[in-house]
Swiss-Prot record:
This is Tol-Pal system protein TolB. It comes from the Bacteria. HAMAP family: TolB. Part of the Tol-Pal system, which plays a role in outer membrane invagination during cell division and is important for maintaining outer membrane integrity. It is found in: Periplasm. Belongs to the TolB family. Its main location: periplasm. The lineage of its organism: Bacteria, Pseudomonadati, Pseudomonadota, Gammaproteobacteria, Alteromonadales. SUPFAM superfamilies: TolB, N-terminal domain (SSF52964), Tricorn protease N-terminal domain (SSF69304). It holds the Pfam family PD40. The gene is tolB. Residues 1-21 form the signal peptide.
Length: 449
């Protein structure tokens, strides 16, 4: 941060939210061949004329991007059922399809629509023919145990895309037992030096759609971090020719300056309860970790070391911080207990390890590992254990984990430009999210919303 060139231009703050079409497009680079084959059948339109929207394109893309599923092409489908009683299970089983999502859309009132859908287990349906029975209150009734989930909702005409993400969440959980994260968002910084205001802080759906610009600036913006309720972002701005930490509501765009100490004000991260921020300050000398109480403005110094301590992240219980430190000679990851002050080294593999963040379960830590001069995203058992390198890209940085722990978004370099990329937590699925103009960096995945 000390090397950033400060230019003498006034800041422009976009206090009115600006929404535009997504500037990110996910390009899958690896992993679909190992995913489970499923079918997302086009929903049957039960109205006149053309259907108002196509849900299934979004759903199929969501499930494919999870890295766990490989939806077959619509052209390869042996039939297009709209409900479980229309399914020819043998035909689907012959294709190796494990599950089917079917549904329908019908007019409900002016610009409102009834959407029905079912998630079907093909193998179970093939065994029972969809007609298995169970004993209930002394009587045999149809069990429908091949129907993993079945729902209906009335939605407005402008809610098709968001409801498609909702259906994806339901299908993902029905098929994996884990909560889906398709209705989440990402925050990031875009940089285009050809613009009058080159730096933009933006929020979009996890897939890059519905981008909303929160802030435009001629000076650098960095390190966005979500509040646990998903309503606010904390970030660093150089708008006043020095590093300062701000907090901003993503819906009202109202913002508040939190710190403006001499020197570095960086790496703000909300505590799990949303009441505090961990951050890096150099007001007392070299960069150290501090905890800032958002309500009282009280400041607690956490580390005292002659070298740099930076990149704090909270453990899920809120009792400790994971951070990067050069106290051992090279950057490595450590943890510090906020009550006792006890510091523990966590990483030993490779030349350097930086930017540690825990998955929601607290069982693994995602980090940037440098080995033979290459920076890759890696996973290590927490607090200590085996390390697995997840990526093949280079110059990887700023990993952020999905709230269900299934995916990691991070910044990397592709064709000499900074882009965002995705990798599944097991490293099998990989994708890029290049910007259509300029560069993009500092991603932060939202909590469940």
């Amino acid at each position: 941060m000390k090397n950033i060139l400060i230019r003498s231009i006034l800041l422009f703050v976009a206090l009115t939210a600006f929404v535009r079409a997504g500037v990110l497009e996910i390009v899958i680079t690896e992993g679909i061949d190992t995913a489970r084959p499923i079918a997302v059948v086009p929903f049957q339109w039960k109205g006149e004329g053309k259907a108002p929207n196509e849900l299934t394109d979004v759903i199929a893309a969501d499930l494919m991007r999870s890295g766990k599923f490989n939806p077959i092409p619509v052209s390869a489908m042996p039939q297009r059922p709209a409900a479980d009683d229309e399914i020819d299970y043998s035909a689907w089983a012959k294709m190796g399809v494990e599950a089917i999502l079917v549904g329908s859309i019908e007019p409900y009132s002016v610009d409102r629509y009834m959407v029905k859908f079912e998630v079907i287990d093909v193998l179970r349906g093939q065994i029972t023919g969809g007609n298995s029975q169970m004993l209930r209150n002394g009587e045999l009734v149809q069990s429908n145990d091949h129907v993993l989930d079945s729902r209906s909702s009335v939605i407005d005409g402008d809610q098709f895309r968001s409801y498609a993400h909702r259906i994806s969440d339901v299908a993902y959980e029905a098929l994996t037992g884990e909560r889906g994260a398709f209705m989440t968002k990402i925050a990031y910084v875009t940089v285009n030096h050809d613009d009058r205001y080159p730096y933009k802080l933006a929020v979009a759906d996890y897939d890059g759609a519905n981008e909303k610009i929160l802030l435009r600036s001629p000076e650098p913006l960095m390190s966005p971090a979500w509040s646990p309720d998903g309503n606010k972002l904390a970030y660093v701005s150089f708008e006043n020719k020095t590093a300062e930490i701000f907090m901003q509501d993503i819906y009202t765009t109202r913002r508040e300056k939190l710190t403006s100490f001499p020197g570095i004000n960086g790496n703000p991260v909300f505590s799990p309860d949303g009441k505090k921020l961990a951050m890096v300050l150099s007001k007392d000398g070299n960069p150290e970790l501090y905890v800032f109480d958002i309500k009282t403005k009280d400041l607690q110094r956490v580390t005292r070391n002659r070298t740099i301590d930076t990149e704090p992240n909270w453990t899920p219980d809120g009792e400790s911080l994971v951070f990067t430190s050069e106290r051992g000679g090279r950057p490595q990851l450590y943890s510090v207990n906020l009550s006792s002050g006890q510091v523990r080294r966590l990483t030993f593999d490779g030349e350097q390890n930086l930017g540690g963040t825990l998955v929601p379960s607290g069982e693994d830590m995602i980090l940037v590992n440098r080995t033979r001069g290459n920076y890759h995203i890696a996973k290590q058992e927490f607090p200590r254990g085996n390390m697995q390198v997840l990526t093949k890209t280079s110059l990887d940085e700023s990993p952020s984990v999905a709230p269900n722990g299934s995916m990691v978004i991070y910044s990397t370099t592709h064709n000499n430009k900074q882009v965002l990329a995705l990798v599944s937590i097991d490293g099998r699925f990989k994708a890029r999210l290049p910007a259509t103009d300029g560069e993009i960096k500092s991603p932060a995945w939202s909590p469940f919303m």
